[in-house]
Amino acid sequence: MINDIKKDAQERMGKSIEALGRNLASIRTGRAHPSILDSVKVPAWGSDMPLNQVAAITVEDARTLKIVAHDKNLSAAIEKAILTSDLGLNPSSAGTTIRVPMPALTEETRKGYTKQASSVAEDAKVAVRNVRRDALADLKKLTKDKEISEDEERRAADEIQKLTDKFVAEIDAAFKAKEKDLLAV
């Protein structure tokens, strides 16, 4: 029972870290990275499709993304979708190839993105702490139902706290790395 609670807590905390990684990857750093365009939806074949499903996105150089539409008729729609997204990017097309230059970040936008990254990291910490709270509540319930002793509960609670501390440290490390990326000129 205790092992099930710990295993469940570890899995849920791991999912919080994965979500943090995805969220941090979508924050622009001034360098070209395909995940920047993950939020872009293109009207194609009767519905809004994620850009990465209707085109191949590659990094051409440090500051340019190259997009090749799978269907050449979608090039204009892809370009329009990128322009109307809130990413502040200006694509230029040449036939079926669309190039998206990454504008250099100003000091103000760097600080804004750093604040956004900090908020995302804080949300991940809250999620990890909520998992800890749930696990501790489950342990208390087992103790109340006399399925485990108070000593076992205390030992398991200490292990869950160590697990929480480990995941919070991972979150801090991921944020520090992103912050370093954002503030590098």
From Swiss-Prot:
Gene Ontology MF, one: ribosomal large subunit binding
SUPFAM superfamilies (alphabetical): Ribosome recycling factor, RRF
CDD domains: RRF
Single GO BP term: cytoplasmic translational termination
Subcellular location: Cytoplasm
Keywords: Cytoplasm, Protein biosynthesis
GO cellular component terms listed in the entry, alphabetical order: cytosol
Name of one Pfam family that matches: RRF
Database matches in HAMAP family: RRF
Family: Belongs to the RRF family.
Function of the protein: Responsible for the release of ribosomes from messenger RNA at the termination of protein biosynthesis. May increase the efficiency of translation by recycling ribosomes from one round of translation to another.
Annotated protein name in UniProt: Ribosome-recycling factor
